[in-house]
Design a protein with these regions (language model features):
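Acidic, surface-exposed loops and disordered segments
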Residues: 1-128
């Protein structure tokens, strides 16, 4: 359980809702050209492939990087980009309007995930 707490999952999930796999996504900063674009493409491919097999995922960027790096024994050259949790969905996720700049996910009364997002009008620079 201590390991799961490093991912702050104990406050979200019931015992039968814990993900079955965690993947720590790292960037090797000793290599030239390592960037967030490549990492984002890798994340998209992993999560899309999982979903094609009925496995849900959650890309987590708001994580305790120092604690997870220590837990995994990651070297100094590795930057922990994110962690992906994989599992079999028991809840639905809904996009909801972001309120007062708050991007924290929350559970509704049905224990479904509410994912705050900014409205399109705020993020589009120009429409044609």
């Amino acid at each position: 359980m201590a390991r799961i707490r490093s991912f702050n999952l104990d406050r979200w999930s019931e015992p039968d809702e814990t993900p079955v796999l965690f993947v720590a996504v790292c960037q090797d900063e000793s290599l030239p050209g390592c960037n967030d674009t490549d990492t984002g493409l890798a994340l998209a491919n992993m999560t899309d492939a999982a979903w094609a097999h009925g496995v849900g995922s959650c890309i987590m960027g708001a994580i305790d990087r120092p604690a997870i790096k220590e837990l995994l024994g990651l070297g100094e050259n590795l930057r922990l980009h994110s962690v992906v949790a994989f599992g079999y969905p028991t809840h639905k996720s809904h996009l909801v309007a972001m309120q007062n700049g708050n991007v924290k996910y929350y559970l509704d009364d049905a224990r479904d995930y509410c994912v705050p997002k900014r409205p399109m009008e705020e993020i589009l620079l120009k429409t044609l």
